[in-house]
């Protein structure tokens, strides 16, 4: 959301001030890492939205209810990190944070709701980003529901696996960042063209999910040529 802070090679900036090509701080393999900002998946500077504020022992992150965040459920501290939607995080759950240069887990001590202005969903080459010193993914519910599950699998996936599938869905953007954003489009509001195509793609496959016995075959049969069609349209319209 507007006003959230991220660390770049230019220093700490508000998330809405990110520029194409910025190197942004994230956590990868348990260590601090810089990742490239590729553009906006979704941006609505003047839109009022209800956000969740997740407060930990040292910091807080404010994000949309269906944004995907990394966590460990309360009472399962020894389990591997997984993901969930922000509105499912509860007091006592653990979030991954950076504190004084150290990567650690902190408990959520308060969950609050507030209406604020500005939606900003950045995409980085890592698919993750540190926002206000808390690790979050770059993805929200529409990617999980329509793209990840529908395109790559015909059955629901654990969300931790869905993150890597969302990364796969955006592989063309990582290879050709101009498919998502450019210097002219980055200042404009709205859901970007490429994720719109992914959403449409997912809804088409959702239409055949009622054929449970055939859906795996259908998905395998149509996903590759449809992906090529989507890429072709995107490439065509980008010139």
Model-derived features: positions:
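HINT superfamily self-processing domains
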Residues: 1-239
């Amino acid at each position: 959301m507007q006003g959230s802070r991220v660390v770049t090679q230019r220093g700490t900036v508000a998330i809405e001030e990110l520029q194409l090509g910025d190197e942004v701080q994230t956590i990868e393999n348990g260590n601090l890492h810089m990742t490239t900002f590729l553009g906006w998946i979704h941006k609505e500077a003047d839109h009022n939205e209800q956000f969740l504020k997740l407060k930990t022992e040292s910091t807080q992150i404010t994000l949309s209810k269906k944004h995907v965040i990394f966590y460990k459920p309360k009472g399962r501290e020894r389990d591997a990190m997984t993901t969930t939607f922000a509105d499912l995080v509860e007091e006592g759950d653990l979030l991954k944070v950076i504190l004084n240069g150290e990567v650690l887990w902190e408990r959520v001590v308060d969950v609050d709701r507030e209406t604020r202005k500005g939606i900003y969903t950045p995409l980085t080459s890592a698919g993750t980003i540190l926002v206000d010193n808390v690790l979050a993914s770059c993805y929200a519910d529409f990617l999980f529901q329509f793209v990840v599950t529908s395109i790559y699998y015909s059955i629901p996936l654990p969300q931790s696996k869905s993150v890597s599938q969302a990364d796969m869905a955006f592989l063309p953007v990582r290879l050709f960042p101009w498919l998502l954003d450019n210097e002219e489009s980055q200042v404009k509001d709205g859901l970007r063209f490429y994720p719109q195509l992914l959403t449409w793609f997912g809804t088409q496959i959702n239409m055949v999910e009622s054929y449970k016995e055939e859906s795996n075959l259908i998905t395998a049969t149509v996903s590759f040529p449809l992906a090529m069609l989507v890429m072709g349209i995107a490439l065509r319209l980008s010139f």
